[in-house]
């Protein structure tokens, strides 16, 4: 077992999956069967979020990429002209940071890339530049895709640092600026002090899901050390200011007294003016944060927290003075080092005051009325839950969460809130914050939603107000309306993810789109900046449509903005563009046709981590740049991947490189397992023992194909069990089609395992018709080929067919082969045999005779009646049944039977006597006794028979 937990040597003695994989990958490459160009067929365009190349492709990539790969192959079988291709994301700072870490021989990085990413040490130590890393991992990613048998059009591949791709991005940014979507200003951004750059999600080692939270700093005042001072309190709920009874200070921590000046940015450039804002006392960490957020901080002195105890501070709204009290729970890493205390509504504050014995002294001030609570909600819920003291964290969290949720959704401000009385809590924050800011009793401070936010370089990130920064104004309400419209008209898999996209659009704020360092496209209208990696990856799907033309040898100089303007928007004069670009008119027109043919994008596939960034940005940029007819049509989201219960980690492991999985298990086993082991939104846990089982079952299909070809073809009349197997197989065609169309690939796996069980049952029931088995294998080879293409190509060839199964059409259902009665009949036999075994197990006898009794006719009549009224529940059904004379005379037995049938399931009536007679020999062989169907009613057992559940007597 290696560092990633993979067992080596998992081949199978009868089938060499690696050899089969090699064979068909070579044939596909030589035949170029996956290269796509516009023609007269219906098109299908699917993409996945391209991988970032700061490591090898891992198990998470495998799942995310194999889903669209499978769908692409399925859509080809539906005679669609499928465009499915890939690019590589390399821009930004992570690759630059990795190069520096390798150059510095950072031990943990060297270990991880040598042992987890499987980079030989001599090769690894050469990766000292971003260019070397890009070259290394682009080759490895390409090889991984090919080893997995992905059906990609490689002519369209590109990297985001390609100069030709940069020309496309330049055009995009010119357009966005022209539309007013890009502005320059001063905004708070997530920032790395070491890299001297704003950082995005992909730049982070920890805290990828952190957001920037806006706190209100309420300016309480006091006198200390002979000076008038401001003691700002950070809060997310400014309405609670009306209920403050005291404030908390951590007596064991260091605070600072400092002169504060606001930095006011001048209209032009990045220069600022300073405006005096008083003397503040805040926590030492807070002072460092404020320096980065438009304030100049001049430290006057340090103060121990216990020196401030007993100080009276004035509430700027109520004008009341409240005391500072000690609390060890005050965290200096969040806010200002002070915490307002609102004990009537905050369980933590109430319990802390109770522990100090200060409740009577400071009192409780109610400010929110909530239906279902008394005057003091915090006191009520603390007593109800039995919270003992401040250390009872679990109950305190429960209490806080409950009250805050109820206050937000059901609470209204009371008379203690003056002019704001009667306003609901959920509507008050924005108004109050605005009023407080205008009255100069509050300011804004920004914090992370998570405390641990670390850049990939290892530096702790801060929130910094960057001046002269370029932003994309995603906060624009009109732009958001278009994004919502797009989302409303898109398909989503799973469907319930739609609302999350709406939420992300609502929450979207202006976003820094450029930085000073890293790989990427120079901002065309300000060469001091480089476009960052979450902004150059929003519409590249459109680039795929014309990439094959560009990759044939067009130069960056030829890719003028007017070319993209014409190809994507139809604007401009082709002759003029030809003249200025030196690209032939024919090529330009072909590029335009290719774009118009393949756009819009039918499906975009990704893991759920890209919802708040890449995917939402894709929607925004498409609705800004393209007409409605070219807006994206669908997004598929899958869960994450773990390895034997362990979370993937590029630095600590496991990683499970894609190429390693392919070599150890074979591409088909990996593809089958990763797409079918979990439902789409669920996280998939890779278990190697289960992968081995999947491999063994796939090989059974191959071995069956070989065996049916080795036996001579003979014409036989179809038996009932033959017809049953054909029914099951042809029924699978529609089931698999629905699964593929709806991205429910786990169902394909479940259907395949059902096939394996069906084949076992068929053999057990005496099935031996080679023609039937060949037909079953042919159909299932087609159904499985999108998931396991190499093995299916091999089986297809073994069955004697020429050409590629990858180019075959989806199988058509033969309605004459579908008969639900056959399936119900076999399930009836299985159920009866299970009942026989259960009776045998209890009675512990070896019967010589077995009597099987089917139900009386009136019971089947009742079943038919229930089928005709299947929408009715038991309560509604019984009065209807009892109106019928043929049922009424059976009295209480009817009601009992209705419940029993409901328990079994209301199914259509079948010819149970005929089915049992047909299966009699089989049942006799299974239990080694004589079977009598509806013979002498021994000991009155027949009356216990109900539809689908024969009565049984043994002797």
UniProtKB/Swiss-Prot annotation:
SUPFAM superfamilies documented for this protein: Anticodon-binding domain of a subclass of class I aminoacyl-tRNA synthetases, Nucleotidylyl transferase, ValRS/IleRS/LeuRS editing domain
Annotated InterPro entries: aa-tRNA-synth_I_CS (IPR001412), aa-tRNA-synth_Ia (IPR002300), Leu-tRNA-lgase_arc (IPR020791), Leu-tRNA-synth_Ia_arc/euk (IPR004493), M/V/L/I-tRNA-synth_anticd-bd (IPR013155), Rossmann-like_a/b/a_fold (IPR014729), tRNAsynth_Ia_anticodon-bd (IPR009080), Val/Leu/Ile-tRNA-synth_edit (IPR009008)
Motif position, 'HIGH' region: 51-61
Record-level Gene Ontology MF annotations: aminoacyl-tRNA deacylase activity; ATP binding; leucine-tRNA ligase activity
Example of a GO biological process term: leucyl-tRNA aminoacylation
Enzyme superclass (EC): ligase
'KMSKS' region, short sequence motif: residues: 647-651
Gene Ontology CC terms: cytoplasm
Binding locations of ATP: 650
Keywords noted in UniProt: Aminoacyl-tRNA synthetase, ATP-binding, Cytoplasm, Ligase, Nucleotide-binding, Protein biosynthesis
Keyword Aminoacyl-tRNA synthetase carried by entry: yes
Localization per Swiss-Prot or TrEMBL: Cytoplasm
EC number(s) given by UniProt: 6.1.1.4
Catalytic activity: tRNA(Leu) + L-leucine + ATP = L-leucyl-tRNA(Leu) + AMP + diphosphate
NCBIfam families: leuS_arch, PRK12300.1
HAMAP family linked to this entry: Leu_tRNA_synth_A
Family: Belongs to the class-I aminoacyl-tRNA synthetase family.
This protein's name: Leucine--tRNA ligase
Annotated organism of origin: Methanococcus maripaludis (strain C5 / ATCC BAA-1333)
Lineage: Archaea, Methanobacteriati, Methanobacteriota, Methanomada group, Methanococci
